[in-house]
Amino acid sequence: MRVVSTDPVGVVSGQTILEFEQTNDMVSARYRGGTILDGYLLGTLDSAGASLRFCYVQVDLHGSVDAGSSICTISHLKDGRLLLREEFQWLTRPGSGTNVFEEMRTTGDDV
């Protein structure tokens, strides 16, 4: 997934790429790019598959470690790709906000 909108107190950017995996209702992802050297998240989907709750931890390019928790609303774009609207709360610093992510097109798809 890629970031399409970032809250001013967020640190993900258009350069941040997230690679998700799912096993039943458990979801994990590794992400990096922009000011994030490496990040991980782990969470669960609700029974309807309409929302995702997770905690994340990340290290930035300066070596600072941050963590937070999020709730994402899951929807679909007209072309069927996933769209996540994340409401996040920092646990290691003040602030909360909203980020938006969309599933990237697979290689060979029309742009």
Task: Tell me what each language-model feature is.
Residues 17-44:
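N-terminal glycine/threonine-rich, aromatic-flanked beta-hairpin/loop signature
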Residues 1-19, 51-111:
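Beta-sheet ligand-binding and adhesion/scaffold domains
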Residues 46-49:
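Short acidic-glycine loop/turn motifs at beta-strand connectors
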